[in-house]
Amino acid sequence: MAHGVHKMNENEYTAAGKDAADSPAIPGHNCDGCVNYALCHPESHKKNGGSSVDGPQEENNMTVVMLADGFEEIEALTPVDVLRRAGLTVRTAGVGGRVITGSHGISVACDMTEDEVRAEDVDLLLLPGGMPGAKNLDASPAVDRLIREVNARGGRLAAICAAPFILGRRGLLSGKNATCYPGFEGELTGAHLSALPVVTDGNITTAKGMGVALDFALELVRVLLPGDASKKIADSVQKQ
């Protein structure tokens, strides 16, 4: 359910004996388990870098979304939004620079470049589709290194639309159930092709395309967090 926001002023917080940064914007609202922390605790959310439910997350415990020119905007930014709602630390990394332009002309100022990402800091490496974005990711030596190193250390990989072909070309889908945008199946070397829109097999999640970007993002919350965080977010955004 969406909240109507009344932000208490400093005097109200003080009278309640609470620190302003850690008190809810909605009087009487129980924030335990709340998925919309940015709304309920806007000051603390901002203080913690805009991504943490229980305080700042460690930088070595994060999701990195790789962006290259020509990326599909909804496939990339829906997971950023949803994972941050779940309290996870998410960073965007640009291939070839910090400002990356999507396939529909939307530019994103990334948090870092691909050369600044350390595989040991990454729990989940996410590859959006879109053309020529997916081809540009595939051609990046830094992205290749990150994919191999994150996978080798047991981290998670996720790819949507055309991007699963990047994993397929590296032999990482062999023996796994996987899906992709129609027409790229031949690139998923050794995979068991699934008709499902979103598939998780082991440490790899794949999805068909932009139309299932929200389902893809919610599945990533499910595999990263225990409990019902994914369901709570789905309910809060009116997912049918």
Locate the predicted segments by residue:
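Cysteine-centered metal-binding/redox modules
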Residues: A2-P56
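Anionic-ligand binding patches
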Residues: A178
